[in-house]
Structures are given as structure tokens and as C-alpha cells.
Amino acid sequence: MKICAIGLRGIPDVMGGIESHCQQLYPRMVKNGASVTVIARSPYVKQKKYTFEGVNVLSVWTLKHKFLETFMHTFFAIIYARIFVHPDVIHLHAIGPALFAPLARLLGMKVVVTHHGADYDRQKWNGFAKFILKLGEKMGVVFGNKVFVVGKTLTERLKQQFPDHADKIVYVPNGMLPSFSGDISSDYLPQELSVSPQNYVLTVGRLVPEKGFHDLVVAYKKANTGLKLVIVGDADHRDEYSVTLLKQANDDILFAGRRGGDELKALFKHAKVFILPSYHEGLPIVALEAISAGTNVLLSDIAPNLDIEAPTDSYFPVGDTGSLSNKITNIDSLSLGMDQAGFLQKFNWDRIAQSTQDYISALFDKKVN
């Protein structure tokens, strides 16, 4: 079975939830016998062609542009895949690329779509962009042979919204890594940040409005705490929001840029608490990674975060900086403990990869329109 993945920026170690998802998913599917080709976006990978843990990665050109990049690349990538890759299945990631599901079907390929979240809720999009993304969602559901959804609540909403296609919409969550659950020395904490175990709060993600980092900075400044704030991540496109956010840096508010490997694991492992104040998510991999590391979490109360089913004390109203500030101030009095082993089993990447592969294989076991 030959699968071609389109919609992600690239792998490995390209910042983003979809990219993290694919980096964990596809090597496991290759080990299970699938042939996988990822068509990456040229601005995010350094080589034209390479292999990552058995996954073939091909770079196809696109303009690096906040609004046009995804749509331009998806169109080119589907044409490229049909001519040069000849896959059995196109795997589209996110509802923007899903707009082109009819094109892939027209070219004679089966299509599966992973719905990573209601992207039209992102604050950066104007009315026209939101319309296009909602249309992409519809095209993915209508023309996809199978639709994987990473959020439980979103899965149920889509089934109600598209009852004629409900049978092909399935819940397949993101996973969490056992490797984050192991011990890692605090010696791997980045020395330039001057942080020590349990003396900082952590957040991780791209510097975009829907992540709510501006709320976190405001809440942190209000809080009565001796903890530092470490923000790991950067912006794909340097804009007014990210520039304004970065100006908040001081001796206690530390922007760590992009981190990976042992540095990132150590930052997760030794944080006092991980905070995700998002306005929009699919199923946040960074929160799962924090839980995997045994670190307590504070999460905004949006549906995808609630789907994680963390303790009640872990949640605060989205956008409510006063509530978040109060939780930071009183962090030691909150009941935040979680069943780490249970979550590792529930959000297990090996099981998720096998389930994904089984669903795709089933498309060839019967006649699928």
C-alpha cells in the first residue's frame, strides 16, 4: 500500500502540531509494512529528496506566504503525486488542503483526510479565509474516502453536521510519547535560560494569536509568583503579533525559540507546570507531551483541551487572565495530579498508527465510492 501525505510543512523537527503528528505516525506505519511518501514544502526542508526513518520525503516548491502557501503547495503536490509518485492513497492533513480532495479523486486516487481542528476559528483569518476553510472541511468530508478526526468532541459535531457521511468519520487522536516519560537530567536544561528544576512555568507553540500566549504573559505579570515563564517556539512568519509578544521579554519572561531533543524533554520534565492558554486546538500534542513527562498542566477550557479529561483544577476559562493568574499564584494548592500510565495507554502512538493503517487498508477490501 503506497500512501502520499500532503498538507504538512515537512518532517522531521519542523515546528507544528501536524508536523509532530506526522513525524510520529508515518515511521510506525512504514514499520507495519506501508510505503509512505511525504511531499514537504520547500521553505521548511533543506534537501530536495531524503528519507526519514523509512519515510520518503520529497520537497515541492511553494511560495512562503501566510495565506497562499498551503493552498498553492497542496495543488502542486497533488499533481506531482499523480505524475511522479503514483500512490494508492493521498492522505491530506487539515481542512485547508482538504479543499483539494475532489481534485485528487478526479485524478483517480483514493483520499483520506485527517481533520486536525476547526482552523476557521483561528484569529488570524478574515471572513473570506474562514469561508474557504469551512468549504475545505466540507470537501474533505464529502469527497474523502475516510475522515480521521483528532478530537472527540469535533468528531461528534462533524457526524451531526454531515449525517450522510457519518459512517466514514472516525475518531483517531494524537498520541503521547513514552520517551517523554523517562528520566532526563536537569543538566540538559538550556544554560542560557538560567532556569532550574521546578522554578519555571512552561508553554510551547508557535507565536500566533490563537495560542493565547499574550494572555499568559498578562496573567503571569499579575501573578504573585517567584517562578519564571519560559515560552518555547517561534513564528513561521514574523508579523506584528509575534514582534509585539517578543518585546515582552525580560529577566523573568524568557523566549527560548525553537527547541528539540533532550533540551525540550528536559524543559517539559523539570517545569513546575505546563500552561496552554489556546483559543484553538485540534488535540494539543504539546499538552500530551507534558502529561507524558509527568508535569502538571493548566489548560484553557476549549473543547479540544477538555477532551483530554484532565482534573477540574487544570482548566481555566479561555481568555480569563484573572483566573489563570490566580491559578499560577496558588499553583501548590491545586489538585492537578493525573494517571500518567493510563494516559500513555489511551494516547499510544503505536496503537494510533495501527488503527490508521487498518482504516486505510479497509478501503481496498470493499468497493468504496
Regions inferred by a protein language model and the residue ranges of each:
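A conserved mid-protein helix/loop that constitutes part of the nucleotide-sugar donor-binding site
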Residues: S20, N199-K222
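Membrane-proximal helix-turn-helix segments that form the acceptor-binding/catalytic region
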Residues: I79, L106, K130-V147, L245
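Short His-centered aromatic/hydrophobic patch
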Residues: L92-P97
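A short, active-site helix/loop in glycosyltransferases that binds the activated sugar's phosphate group
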Residues: V141-I169, P173-F180
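Nucleotide-activated donor-binding/catalytic signature segment of Leloir-type glycosyltransferases, i.e.
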Residues: S242-D262
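Aromatic "clamp/platform" in nucleotide-sugar-dependent glycosyltransferases that forms part
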Residues: Y279
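Short hydrophobic beta-strand element within catalytic cores of glycosyltransferases
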Residues: S292, N296-L299
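Conserved acidic donor-binding segment of nucleotide-sugar-dependent glycosyltransferases
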Residues: D313-G322, I328-S333
